[in-house]
Regions:
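Mature extracytoplasmic domains of secretory-pathway proteins
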Residues: 71-138
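Post-signal peptide N-terminal segment of mature Sec-exported envelope proteins
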Residues: 29-51
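C-terminal motif of bacterial Sec signal peptides marking the signal peptidase cleavage site
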Residues: 18-21
Length: 186
């Protein structure tokens, strides 16, 4: 009995550092996430429309937005594995304010929104780089985030789209009262 207790204690002591993890400083020369900040309101935020729905349907962006979301633009089909539970435009049914965000050295129009019937759990963030050639989006679906990228020079993967979108979202949260998304209907 005593021997099994000692083995268990030893196993706990050996596994605790592994399961707790450790913080390792970044390697010299590596960079962290890009710095993002919300810019003062100006007319650039409204160049493609005054609301999320106007931006999604703007003639200059319409085809790019549909290409950005691909198959997720349309309503899901039964048995569609890996698809969203709603069509991408529904994540912007209730749109928040359009804002300008600077990430690193680029300015983006930031459009937030949520699904009318599930505003707390179905949220969207769309970034349109100034000039409209690069688009990135994050659709949050009850704990899962789906990232989309479109345009020349837009990079996916761990150092790309997800990191840029997360930086933008943090900046928008700091500039608002904690959540840049529309509030659920009462």
């Amino acid at each position: 009995m005593r021997r099994s207790l000692l083995r268990g204690a030893l196993a706990c002591l050996l596994l605790t550092p592994v399961t707790a993890g450790c913080v390792v400083p970044p390697e010299p020369g590596s960079s962290g996430p890009p710095e993002a900040k919300v810019l003062p309101a100006d007319a650039r935020a409204l160049v493609y429309g005054r609301s999320a729905s106007e931006v999604l349907e703007n003639p200059e962006l319409r085809d790019k937005v549909r290409a950005l979301f691909g198959a997720d633009w349309a309503p899901p089909t039964p048995g569609g594995v890996g698809k969203l539970t709603l069509a991408a435009p529904q994540y912007f049914e209730r749109g928040g304010p359009l804002r300008m965000v600077r990430i690193a050295d680029a300015d983006y129009i930031a459009i937030t929104g949520c699904a009318a019937q599930a505003c707390a759990s179905r949220r969207g963030l769309l970034l349109v780089r100034e000039g409209g050639e690069q688009l990135m989006a994050r659709l949050d679906e009850g704990g899962f985030s789906h990232h989309h990228a479109y345009g020349p020079g837009v990079v996916g993967g761990p150092g790309g789209t997800a990191v840029v979108l997360e930086s933008a979202l943090r900046a928008l949260e700091r500039a608002s009262d904690g959540s840049p998304f529309p509030r659920p209907a009462p």
